[in-house]
UniProtKB/Swiss-Prot annotation:
One of its GO terms (cellular component) is cytoplasm. Its EC number is 2.5.1.55. It catalyses: D-arabinose 5-phosphate + phosphoenolpyruvate + H2O = 3-deoxy-alpha-D-manno-2-octulosonate-8-phosphate + phosphate. Keywords: Cytoplasm, Lipopolysaccharide biosynthesis, Transferase. It comes from Pectobacterium atrosepticum (strain SCRI 1043 / ATCC BAA-672) (Erwinia carotovora subsp. atroseptica). Pfam families: DAHP_synth_1. GO terms for biological process: keto-3-deoxy-D-manno-octulosonic acid biosynthetic process. Belongs to the KdsA family. The keyword Transferase applies. The keyword Transcription regulation does not apply. It is an enzyme of class 2 (transferase). GO terms for molecular function: 3-deoxy-8-phosphooctulonate synthase activity. This is 2-dehydro-3-deoxyphosphooctonate aldolase.
């Protein structure tokens, strides 16, 4: 299998290249907090020599409760993203939830993300494909790794083959997720070598069966991330917050911002080691 290279500007993304970090905050809470978090990520990744793409959502359209914070919206969100790009020179990834958002978002950011819950919505896939932007497809919790090839095919039929796939866990009974480490390789093969990344933040979610917000297991983020990166992946997706207990979305799964550097030191060491090994085919 040949590993496909997808380029985000001058950043190459491939399963056999040094990993790319997709990281930032779950949702834009304020302009000032976005600047603070982005600056910290930029400082740490530059120090460690890790290619970096900033992540945040401008609208969390799939919150469990109608009363939950969703974000600043499209117009204000794009203004914040433009300022981040101008200030720090970063590439940016964000998600879209409606077809009409695809082009306005693609005009500002570098990667547009197809949310897991919407990954089989053909109208949205077609609208995103038409932008020509790099696409990050989240694997739905209810879809097997091998079925991701069908979603990739939709994008290719729509004229866009610049696809990254992202695993964020699979349903395990009610209100729980697990990550199948063998599934990463299945996704690579099902998509003809497309880059595969791991969203360790959302894989740590666990729900209160009667509550209106997701719980999480941030205390296990290092172990799960290390396990995933040992497979050999194109990138890692992780969200951080300076005060996870008071984050407006998914705080229980967020990495404390002050732990980012030591965390990434471990991840980079594993990635460097794994990708120094020659490929070993044990299928025959």
């Amino acid at each position: 299998m040949t590993n496909k290279v997808v380029k985000i500007g001058d950043i190459p993304v491939a399963n056999d290249l040094p990993f790319v970090l997709f990281g930032g905050m779950n949702v834009l809470e304020s302009r000032d907090l976005a600047m603070r978090i982005c600056e910290h990520y930029v400082t740490v990744t530059q120090k460690l020599g890790i290619p970096y793409v900033f992540k945040a959502s401008f609208d969390k359209a799939n919150r469990s409760s109608i009363h939950s914070y969703r974000g600043p919206g499209l117009e204000e969100g794009m203004k914040i993203f433009q300022e981040l790009k101008q200030t720090f020179g970063v590439k940016i990834i964000t998600d879209v939830h409606d077809s009409h958002q695809a082009q306005p978002v693609a005009d500002v950011v570098d990667v547009i993300q197809l949310p897991a819950f919407l990954a089989r919505q053909t109208d949205l896939v077609e609208a995103m494909a038409k932008t020509g932007a790099v696409i990050n497809v989240k694997k739905p919790q209810f879809v097997s790794p091998g079925q991701m090839g069908n979603i990739v095919d939709k994008f290719i039929e729509g004229g866009n083959d610049q696809i990254i796939l992202c695993d964020r866990g699979s349903n395990f009974g009610y209100d729980n997720l697990v990550v199948d480490m063998l599934g990463f390789n299945v996704m690579k093969h099902a998509s003809n070598g497309s880059p595969v990344i791991f969203d360790v933040t959302h894989a740590l979610q666990c729900r209160d069966p009667f509550g209106a917000a997701s719980g999480g297991r941030r205390g296990q983020v290092t172990e799960l991330a290390r396990a995933g990166m040992a497979v050999g992946l194109a990138g890692l997706f992780i969200e951080a917050h300076p005060d996870p207990a008071n984050a407006k979305c998914d705080g229980p799964s967020a990495l404390p911002l002050d732990k980012l550097e030591p965390f990434l030191q471990q991840i980079k060491a594993i990635d460097d080691l794994v990708k120094s090994f020659p490929e070993l085919d044990t299928s025959n």
